[in-house]
C-alpha cells in the first residue's frame, strides 16, 4: 500500500535586528517579502514556519520547531545583511540540507532616489552569503 507523505520543509528568513529600530519601515517590508516568498513554495510540501529571525533567541526557537517537526530540508531567505548567529542556532544539529535564498528585490535600482531603508529592504542582495556558507561548512 502506497502512503502519500509530504516532505517537511523548515522555512525562515533572517535580517539584522539592529536595523529594525533604526529603520522601522523595514518591518512591514520584510514581512511582505517573507509572505510572498512562502507563497512560492509548492503545496506538495509541509511548511514548518520558523518566522522572521532577527535575534539568536528567535533562531533557537525556529530550530526547536524544526527539530520537533523532524524537517527534511531547511530553506533560509536572506532579507538583508545578517550575521550567522541569526542562522546557526536554527540549523545546527539538524543534519539536513540548507538552501540559502538571496535575491535582490528590484531589477534596476534608482540610485539617485534611494535612501538607506530602501537599500537595505529592497536592493541589497545579501553580502553575508559567504559568511553563512563558511559557517554552515564548519557547523
Regions found by a protein language model. Give the residues of each.
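Metallocofactor- and cofactor-centric catalytic cores in central/energy metabolism, strongly enriched
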Residues: 1-139
Amino acid at each position: 500500500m502506497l502512503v502519500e507523505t509530504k516532505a517537511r520543509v523548515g522555512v525562515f528568513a533572517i535580517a539584522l535586528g539592529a536595523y529594525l529600530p533604526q529603520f522601522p519601515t523595514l518591518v512591514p517590508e520584510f514581512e511582505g517579502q517573507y509572505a510572498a516568498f512562502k507563497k512560492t513554495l509548492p503545496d506538495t510540501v509541509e511548511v514548518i514556519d520558523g518566522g522572521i529571525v532577527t535575534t539568536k533567541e528567535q533562531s533557537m526557537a525556529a530550530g526547536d520547531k524544526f527539530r520537533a517537526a523532524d524537517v527534511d530540508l531547511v530553506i533560509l531567505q536572506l532579507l538583508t545583511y545578517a550575521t550567522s548567529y541569526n542562522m546557526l542556532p536554527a540549523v545546527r544539529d539538524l543534519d539536513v540540507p540548507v538552501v540559502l535564498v538571496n535575491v535582490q528585490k528590484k531589477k534596476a535600482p534608482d540610485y539617485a532616489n534611494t535612501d538607506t531603508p530602501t537599500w537595505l529592504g529592497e536592493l541589497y542582495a545579501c553580502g553575508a552569503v559567504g559568511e553563512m556558507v563558511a559557517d554552515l561548512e564548519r557547523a
